[in-house]
């Protein structure tokens, strides 16, 4: 059977999808090899969220063809969906598969290889034998993602991680932030049936996974495309209509309904949720989440800017004060929750005054972690044609200021644990400065280390350890003195 090398770029949704694709190929008998080795087929699951991500996608595709010019190079995902013309003209790409067709990867590959064999048989002595199949993109491999209401059902049985499994619960986004190309790459909101999610998580629990993370493109919109009456009957039936595509669905309680069902699954001890819109955090949803002991107090609330004028240009549908209220609600019902966020610097029109407002707001909120991004112009978005584009050197300076602020806030949050007890799910063994440690995370996702030499007999991966935090191993990792281990 042919050998296949896979490479993934981008978000946790992409990571989930490439693991499913690898699983499907293995079930079909393909041999999986590392991407830096010679393979018959190279598959790159691409990303296009920023210019750099798209460039890296192209680089990996070109690297594959350079590694083995005779190999079949397959581009999959978001870059294919948004860069159709570039993909068609790229001589390094033999086959392109868009989003919502990843579940059909194996069958598409088999059909392509059959066509290739027939072409080679006809042109056995011809100069162009070997890659004569027309790769022009068409609806069989790249669908019109903007006009599909069908969720692409895939199920993951195992994952590369030993303790934590990412579970995809929805795809697509209806928000159309002015800087973002993702709605065009992923299409409108399409939610996964709750029954399929529960079945997959139950299977993961039986396979020994103790922690799951719900992920998606815009998980705050989970369930907004379901028929209300069917949902009340316990059914997940999608009824998305063309004229409803751009409605604002944030604040849906169906995500909380789903969390409550997952909470009842035996064997799952920790539940995490991916990036949330701040508007989904209301008094009701916060109170309901607080009633779920398995739900980890770690919330990623996407901010992007602390300046209201910038938020309006971004088409973010909240104010900085509304964001602050959402954080306050979470801190009211959870004890010292970890709040993380994303911030974009150098958005078109961002003045020094607006940037100062953002800094002041970040200082006011105090985050556990902040992901700082320099604005990246994406073709086809409204922000790409806005006036007053910010020069790159200014973006770099502002990014540096926020990264320094992030480092201070993050260490301050971790320092809260000093002298306190913590519960850690151990995940891996790693050497740090010549010493071997077992590493894991607290419920609020602070990384903690346990010395392996002193506790090797008791401490193994996928074990829960409780103990007292004694200090820092480094700026990002706390040192735990174990008191109790439990399977």
Residue ranges of each PLM-predicted region?
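Short flexible coil/turn linkers enriched for glycine and charged/polar residues
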Residues: 160-163, 173-174, 295, 305, ...
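Aromatic/acidic polysaccharide-binding cleft in carbohydrate-active enzymes
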Residues: 374-388
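Terminal RNA-binding accessory module
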Residues: 126-129, 385-487
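Proteins enriched for Cys/Gly/acidic motifs involved in redox and nucleic-acid/cofactor modification
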Residues: 1-222, 229, 236, 254, ...
């Amino acid at each position: 059977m042919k050998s296949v090398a896979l490479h993934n770029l981008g978000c946790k949704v992409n990571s989930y999808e490439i693991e499913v694709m690898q699983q499907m190929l293995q079930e079909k008998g393909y041999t999986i090899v590392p991407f830096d080795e010679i393979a018959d087929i190279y598959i790159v699951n691409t990303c296009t969220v920023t210019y750099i991500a798209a460039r890296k996608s192209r680089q990996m595709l070109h690297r594959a063809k350079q590694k083995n010019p005779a190999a079949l190079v397959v581009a999959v995902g978001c870059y294919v969906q948004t860069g159709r013309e570039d993909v068609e003209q790229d001589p390094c790409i033999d086959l392109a598969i868009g989003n919502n067709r990843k579940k059909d990867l194996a069958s598409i590959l088999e059909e392509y290889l059959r066509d290739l064999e027939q072409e080679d048989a006809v042109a056995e002595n011809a100069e162009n034998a070997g890659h004569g199949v027309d790769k022009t993109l068409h609806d069989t491999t790249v669908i019109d993602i903007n006009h599909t209401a069908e969720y692409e059902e895939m199920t993951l049985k195992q994952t590369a991680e030993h303790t934590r499994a990412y579970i995809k619960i929805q795809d697509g986004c209806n928000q159309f932030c002015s800087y973002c190309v993702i709605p065009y790459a992923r299409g409108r909101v399409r939610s996964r049936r709750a029954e399929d999610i529960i079945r997959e998580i139950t299977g993961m629990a039986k396979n020994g996974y103790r922690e799951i993370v719900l992920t998606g493109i815009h998980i705050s919109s989970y369930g907004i495309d379901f028929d209300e009456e069917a949902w009340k009957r316990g059914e997940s039936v999608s009824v998305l209509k063309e004229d409803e595509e751009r409605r604002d669905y944030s604040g849906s309680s169906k995500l909380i309904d789903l969390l409550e069902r997952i909470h009842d699954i035996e064997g799952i001890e920790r539940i995490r949720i991916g990036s949330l819109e701040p508007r989904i955090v209301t008094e009701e949803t916060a109170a309901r989440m607080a009633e779920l002991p398995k739900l980890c107090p770690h919330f990623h609330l996407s901010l992007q800017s602390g300046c209201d004028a910038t938020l309006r240009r971004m088409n973010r549908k909240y104010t900085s004060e509304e964001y602050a209220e959402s954080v306050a609600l979470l801190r009211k019902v959870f004890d010292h929750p970890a709040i993380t966020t994303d911030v974009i610097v150098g958005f078109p029109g961002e003045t020094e005054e607006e940037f100062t407002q953002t800094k002041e707001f970040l200082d006011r909120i105090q985050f556990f972690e902040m992901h700082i991004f320099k604005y990246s112009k994406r073709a086809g978005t409204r922000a790409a044609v806005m006036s007053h584009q910010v020069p790159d050197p200014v973006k770099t300076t502002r990014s540096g200021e926020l990264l320094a602020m992030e480092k201070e806030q993050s260490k301050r949050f971790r320092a809260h644990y000093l002298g306190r007890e913590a519960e850690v799910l151990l995940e891996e063994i790693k050497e740090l400065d010549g010493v071997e440690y077992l590493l894991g995370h607290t419920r609020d996702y602070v990384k903690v280390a346990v010395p392996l030499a002193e506790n090797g007999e008791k401490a193994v991966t996928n074990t829960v350890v409780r103990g007292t935090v004694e200090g820092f191993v480094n700026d990002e990792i706390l040192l735990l003195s174990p008191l109790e281990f439990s399977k």
